């Protein structure tokens, strides 16, 4: 089958969406499918090796903020999108932003089957403005996503049952399929002795970008209230704009957290 995957984020593996998209593409190709990709450019000539590139959106004075948050949104290019879509049997679109919205309209015009995924919660958007707890704002974003993007698709991939429930409660009538994003085969259950310095500790591992919605701050703030606070050792694997803040919170703990972006083998 010829499949076109359209995703804004497809660069450094520093966020869950990028990791999920790359895993999807690699596994589809392993199963014999011909996969083309449309994403923000990285210098690769558009159309080479099935990779169609478009420019990133220029946020002007906010570019540094956007970069720190690991958010790269692609600028729609109708010519490139049509080239990437025209020979496909089905198109899978990851994000409900300008590139994805342009793509679903082109697919509707060209009568190409479309599947989508729900990887961006409205709270992920509103948190950048400190409004993640505003029901009115988040409800509006759910409606905006539905009207401008998801209404064009009959199928939505939901990574968790929680996401599926949220969509149903906000009026999404599509076929919602819950499929886990999965775990890299490198991570398998096994027992191994703890390093000596952690032998008597309750070790807690958190893996996520250092951003508000991942709630690492709440984890660190909660530890002093635990009965065994002096026995808890937290490992926070990732990167992001809140790293300095997490380190400041960690300094107050008896066992400061180990914070960084370790290689997969170490993780």
Name these PLM-found stretches.
Residues 1-45, 49, 55, 86:
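N-terminal subdomain of nucleotide-sugar transferases
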Residues 3, 90, 107-127, 157:
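Active-site proximal beta-strand in glycosyltransferases
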Residues 4, 195-225, 234-235:
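Conserved donor-binding/catalytic core segment of Leloir-type glycosyltransferases
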Residues 41, 162, 182:
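Carbohydrate-associated surface elements
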Residues 81-100, 112-115:
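Short N-terminal targeting/anchoring amphipathic segment
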Residues 109, 137-155:
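Membrane-proximal helix-turn-helix segments that form the acceptor-binding/catalytic region
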Residues 183-200:
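Acidic anion/phosphate-binding donor-loop and adjacent secondary structure
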Residues 244-266:
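Nucleotide-activated donor-binding/catalytic signature segment of Leloir-type glycosyltransferases, i.e.
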């Amino acid at each position: 089958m010829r499949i076109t995957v359209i995703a804004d984020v497809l660069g450094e593996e520093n966020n869950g969406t990028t990791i999920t998209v790359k895993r999807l593409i690699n596994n589809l190709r392993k199963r014999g499918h011909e996969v083309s990709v449309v994403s923000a450019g990285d210098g690769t000539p558009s159309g080479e090796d099935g990779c169609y590139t478009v420019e990133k959106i220029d946020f002007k004075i906010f570019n540094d903020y956007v970069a720190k948050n690991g958010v790269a949104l692609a600028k729609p290019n109708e010519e490139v999108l049509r080239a990437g879509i025209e020979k496909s049997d089905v198109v899978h679109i990851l994000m409900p932003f300008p590139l994805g919205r342009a793509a679903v309209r082109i697919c509707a015009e060209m009568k190409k089957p479309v599947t989508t995924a729900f990887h961006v919660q409205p709270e992920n958007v509103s948190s950048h403005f400190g409004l993640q707890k505003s029901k009115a704002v988040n409800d509006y974003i759910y409606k905006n996503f539905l009207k401008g993007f998801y209404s064009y698709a009959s199928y939505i991939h939901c990574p968790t049952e929680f996401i599926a429930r949220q969509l149903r409660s906000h009026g999404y009538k599509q076929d919602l399929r819950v499929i886990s994003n999965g775990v890299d085969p490198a991570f398998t259950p096994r027992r191994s002795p703890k390093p000596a310095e952690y032998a008597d500790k309750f070790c807690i591992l958190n893996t996520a970008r250092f951003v508000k919605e991942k709630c690492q701050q709440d984890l660190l703030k909660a530890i002093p209230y635990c009965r065994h606070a002096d026995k808890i050792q937290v490992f926070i694997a990732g990167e992001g704009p809140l790293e300095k803040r997490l380190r400041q919170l960690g300094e107050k703990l008896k066992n400061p957290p180990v914070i960084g972006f370790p290689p997969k083998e170490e993780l």
